């Protein structure tokens, strides 16, 4: 009953928000199965909520009005973060039973006009929201989206530009604090976007921790072997070699050498074997 959430989002996911033809009495399911598309009724659900808010306002039920407004405020805040635009606001087109997104400097646009990346992310968020919302409707209080659960997302980076890859996992884990997210990815920007996570290489059968300590370049070129090792590491290794060969170092140079030595000693052999080998030489 929304108390434990399970969901799976495949790599080839396509966001489809069913457009309302009018007001519908949307009933959220007690339980959604793992692959069921709960998010596709988002717009219908929002129209239903606005209608209920209007009825409550007419009846003088301020508590319901405020609770529903809190829901919209929180969803709007999520859009502002995900779309990286603080001017984002939801606009209800009551004549056409639809919602549009208003952004400073452009005409209001529909959810269907979002790019594949933004659409995909908002779809995941809305799907999980609707899986949990049964709770607060029953308890007559605003949901904190703190239900426990396990969510699988295949190739999380699909359609996402770099900045969105960096923020998506931190956003999901903050918005849904009790959900365990298990994701597959080839993106270094996702791998180092969060500190309290473990990574497992399915090819090498290696478990890695705290990849947030490494730059995206180090992960991309060192771990993913896009190059023998990263350009940054190359420069640092050359600098370290230069400092090691120097005889009369300043206090600042000795401190820099010690700092680099500690960094290279802590490099995982699985993360950047070539760089470590170079250091040991």
Stretches with model-predicted labels:
Residues 83-90, 136, 275:
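Long, hydrophobic, amphipathic alpha-helical segments used as structural scaffolds
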Residues 65-73, 118, 230, 250, ...:
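Generic detection of long, well-ordered alpha-helical segments
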Residues 80, 84-85, 177, 225, ...:
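Residue-level recognition of short, structured coil/turn motifs
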Residues 97-229:
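Switch/communication elements of ASCE P-loop NTPase nucleotide-binding domains
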Residues 1-82, 220, 225, 237-241:
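Coupling/switch segment of ABC-type P-loop NTPase heads
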Residues 166, 208-281:
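Acidic, Mg2+-coordinating catalytic modules of nucleic-acid enzymes
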Residues 86-102:
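Long, charged, glycine-rich C-terminal linkers/tails
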Residues 1, 75-86, 128, 132, ...:
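Hydrophobic, Leu/Ile/Phe/Ala-enriched alpha-helical segments that form helix-helix packing faces
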């Amino acid at each position: 009953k929304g108390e434990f959430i399970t969901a799976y989002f495949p790599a080839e996911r396509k966001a489809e928000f069913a457009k309302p033809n009018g007001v519908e009495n949307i009933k959220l399911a007690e339980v959604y199965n793992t692959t069921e598309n709960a998010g596709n009724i988002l717009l219908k659900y929002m129209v239903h909520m606005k209608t209920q808010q209007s009825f409550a306002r007419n009846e003088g039920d301020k508590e319901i009005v405020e609770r529903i407004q809190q829901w919209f405020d929180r969803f709007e805040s999520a859009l502002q973060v995900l779309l990286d635009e603080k001017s984002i606001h939801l606009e209800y087109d009551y004549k056409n039973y639809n919602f549009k997104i208003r952004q400073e400097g452009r005409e209001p646009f529909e959810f269907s006009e979002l790019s594949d990346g933004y659409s995909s992310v908002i779809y995941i968020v809305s799907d999980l929201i609707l899986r949990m919302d049964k709770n607060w409707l029953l308890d007559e209080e605003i949901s904190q989206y703190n239900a426990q659960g396990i969510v699988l997302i295949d190739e999380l980076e699909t359609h996402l530009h770099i900045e969105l890859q960096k923020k998506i996992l931190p956003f999901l884990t903050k918005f849904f604090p009790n959900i365990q997210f298990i994701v597959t990815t080839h993106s270094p920007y996702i791998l180092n976007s969060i500190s309290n996570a473990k990574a497992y290489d399915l090819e090498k059968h290696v478990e890695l921790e705290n990849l947030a300590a490494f730059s995206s370049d180090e992960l991309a070129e060192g771990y993913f072997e896009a190059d023998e090792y990263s350009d940054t590491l190359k420069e640092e290794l050359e600098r370290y070699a230069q400092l090691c060969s120097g005889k009369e170092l300043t206090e600042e140079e000795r401190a820099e050498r010690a700092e680099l030595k500690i960094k290279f000693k802590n490099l995982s052999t699985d993360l950047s074997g070539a760089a470590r080998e170079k250091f040991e030489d």
